[in-house]
Each structure stands twice: as structure tokens, then as C-alpha cells.
């Protein structure tokens, strides 16, 4: 398992394109990219936002994110919760998960 971290994407995931994030070539869904705050991918439900979320889902790795101060919390609250590695998450897509506050993951 490999773990990569970034933050403050604010809905712009261009830094995750293969040309910029070259390490992703050999990754699998068992490898994680953690976005530490200000994910911005769940903001207004727009078509372009949905396209970016689908694009993230199509990556070879799993995207995890922690909410920051620039999130649409009303929209985030509309997603169902499930348990993942012992803590609660909100699956935005099967491989794009919001790591909820106050949780501990194994």
C-alpha cells in the first residue's frame, strides 16, 4: 500500500494528472491519495464538478479527503454514511471517500 498526500485542491485536480503525478502509474485502488482539507470537489453539483468526480473515480488509486474550511457542508451532509476501516465515511464515488471528522481509521 502506498499513501500520497496533498491539500487545498479547491476543486482543481490538475495536479493529479499523470504528467504531474507520475507515481500513479503503478498504483491500485489499495493505494491512497489523501487530500488534507479544502477538497472542493463537492461544491455545487455542476456538470463540470461531476466530470471531475468521475475522473477521480477512474484513477487507479483511491482518493480520500478530509474537509477543510472551504467546503460546501450542506451538500456534504446530503451524502449517506458508511463504515470504512472502522470509521465513518461518506462515499462520493466508490473510490472517492470523505473521511468524516472525529473518526479513527484502522
Tell where the protein language model's regions lie, with residue ranges.
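Extreme N-terminal starter segment of soluble prokaryotic enzymes
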Residues: 1-4
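Core catalytic region of metal-dependent phosphoesterases/phosphodiesterases
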Residues: 6, 12-105
